[in-house]
């Protein structure tokens, strides 16, 4: 299950951009896109409603006879607890069911009534087993605090975990192996998607580290970007991650700091 992130901005332009991303993934990354995740107000900046964006794009693709993708690409909306009370969150969960979505991504609010674990439990209570629940996790799941949080999400009923972006194949392998240990220990069959981040300048990478988004781009990766090996650095990371995904039968999830950045899909890559 290969997934990508897409931020809706203007429906007509979005259609063309998304088609280019899907085609680029197929031709340049060797991946068929299985699902497109629509984020909700990333980095606390207002964006098109995730539910509405996912619904509109899904309907447009289903009506586009020349797209070639409508029968295989799933659109996944995101519900974020940030700034919402319980009633508002329940309303959005009901919207997922009403809209006929088969998956939804869930993000707990830092200051909201429901954290990620409680949000998963509430969604499972309302949606039953009809909808697949997706949530995120820190990369270092072998560390006690992150591991405990992940266990709580797994026990609450999450179906797929997407990790924060990974920049080291060694860290990725350690994460996968520990995830399988947790699966066996808990008797839970949730799926894992490793986060891959398409970043194409050292300046952008430094800004991300300064913003403290919950993950850090390592010095070794920054150094490679500084030395001008932007294309080579990304391709090397992608190939390593793709090989690991095949070896362990897991999935990848591709996003970029500048949303909808076609360079990550081989279109005009540096």
Descriptions of predicted regions:
Residues 6-24, 28, 105-141, 184-247, ...:
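Active-site pocket-lining/capping segments in soluble small-molecule metabolic enzymes
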Residues 13-14, 44-57, 84-91, 109-126, ...:
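Active-site-adjacent beta->alpha loops and helix N-cap segments on the catalytic face
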Residues 22-39, 153-158:
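Catalytic domains of carbohydrate-active enzymes, especially glycoside hydrolases
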Residues 35-38, 44-89:
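Metabolite-binding pocket within alpha/beta catalytic cores that recognizes anionic/polar moieties
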Residues 35-47, 80, 102-111, 136, ...:
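Catalytic beta/alpha-barrel core
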Residues 142-156:
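Active-site glycine-rich loop that binds ribose-phosphate moieties when present
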